């Protein structure tokens, strides 16, 4: 079975303080210990022997780690996407992958300003990367909502958000951080539940939401148990004229938020082969479709896109299948975990242009194209308690991942006239397929040098089939200072391999001139994939101090990421065709830097009343080549929660989020936008209030008001003409959820 954990209330209380502080949420007193005992993993017990926790468990106590519990989600239910509650964690915002403002309402999870492409999403520790099936645009954006909406909120046991050095152990794509969504496991007796949720905006121009889900779980035999859940969710799109009168350029069509139609079905069969061996079999199917609101990449809508929006058409849909077998074992020498995983994503969408101003614009013929992304993954690790010199737990592990992509539509951009490019065949002769493999070995050691002094060194080696070896060393340390203070520090080298569009010489984009780099004076431009790229790397550092006494918890963490080789569409031309068109390749930029502070405060005002706050303050975030930010995020973000357990049955919560000013890019990078708008988004706040009542063990209701003071933002364009005003903030809305169970 799983490693047995010492379930002392002291360990649980420490974890409670950490989760309340870092997550900005408070749990009801009568549920705290029961829920958090499940996570008291700081001490592992093998038979009668008590040993230290693993390196992974120790790193989850680092300054850059937050926990969102099922109770947090129940008290603050997301309207549609888990990213809505994840964004309330320190260091987390929602934004695009660049400062362009394109697809401005498709905001994804950004951790410490490193952009969504540097945020790795896991479900039960397994990578989820369906967004990689969506074409990667010239400015670094994808027309996707990301990978944070594959699990219904009601089926989440907890969410772990890892930032900085603690995330580097997870390999490619985790340079910003990791979001690990842990689902609920099979129960020890037959249980079932059903939840319905509705969110009704006060303004008829904002899209409403209806959601329903069920779950069923329990034993089948003494050794066999199961869990199954399903959900259906619909969020309407915003009205097509929601931004009318607010756009900087009235001739442009600036769309609101698109709607979604989601369906999820998942099952798990858990087999306890022996008291010390458990094998889980998992399978799931999800369908995500949009309800089109009229968005185009360059806000240049047509009669065709307007008609699709008026009809509420579904212009893209994604089908995801996932299968996994997981073995967890406890042995006389330690513990083990092995995972075999396969997932595929079919991405069906109306075909879009690939050239110039019509890049990302749906074609008039309304024909669907399809791409298919497949991932094959194997991983395994051993945790070995050792007693030589110091008490320690050594972790050794290996991973293998093969990613394949078949995307004919995105590779069909042709040459102009008699142009040709070395290494890039004509459109009809290109293979639509690309692939990559990564093999990895890693070793970590969690060492107790002396009571109160922990040292966790690690080393990871990744071997990419196209880009060779990458070493990722790490070192984390923790030192208690007396009874109340703890200092924690970490440094790690993280990396991200080029994606299957950036590295594919068959992937070609074209602009007749306006979208060319600002340094060019004439001719059109081709942007082509580059199979000689280097991996992106980042040296992530953090230093934090924590104070704990009598229920009070306070912390302050400094972080800095020195980012190298970010892959971008370059400003420099590598050559010209015979007709005078410019040739560019995806290239590695030189350096960028992200730096900031994270602060936390938990105040136990009363036995049943707590106040928790977290603050993120960005000192700098910029590409040193262009001076532009890596992504547009607030100067600071303040999340605060006042949680009152009024009675055994009644709980209430008051929440607020204050966003500091958001600065746009400072410098234009393309020929048609040598000067960009300097319009900022000023400081604003979003408040919410909710209350929940438990009628019985089998029936509970919760309702609330979001955006209590109706603070709205309107999308005004892309960054070159609207600065930072590139997204909609919806207005006041009323929600209610009801859960019945047996």
UniProtKB/Swiss-Prot annotation:
Span list, region Disordered: 91-112, 409-435
Knockout mutant characteristics: Deletion decreases sensitivity to siderophore-beta-lactam drug conjugates. In a pvdD and pchEF double mutant background, in iron restricted culture, able to grow in the presence of enterobactin or various synthetic catecholates, but fails to grow when enterobactin receptor pfeA is also deleted. In a pvdF and pchA double mutant background, in iron restricted culture, growth inhibited by 60% in the presence of dopamine and delayed in the presence of other catecholamines such as epinephrine; growth is inhibited further, but not completely abolished, when piuA is aso deleted.
Keyword entries, A-Z: Cell outer membrane, Disulfide bond, Ion transport, Iron, Iron transport, Membrane, Porin, Receptor, Signal, TonB box, Transmembrane, Transmembrane beta strand, Transport
A GO BP entry: siderophore transport
InterPro entries attached to this UniProt entry: Plug_dom, Plug_dom_sf, TonB-dep_rcpt-like, TonB-dep_rcpt_b-brl, TonB_rcpt_b-brl_sf, TonB_rcpt_CS, TonB_sidphr_rcpt
Residue ranges of domain TBDR plug in the record: 57-184
Pfam families: Plug, TonB_dep_Rec_b-barrel
Cysteine pairings via disulfide bonds: 516-525
Main location: membrane
Keyword Ligase attached: no
Name of the protein in its database record: Ferric enterobactin receptor PirA
Biological source species: Pseudomonas aeruginosa (strain ATCC 15692 / DSM 22644 / CIP 104116 / JCM 14847 / LMG 12228 / 1C / PRS 101 / PAO1)
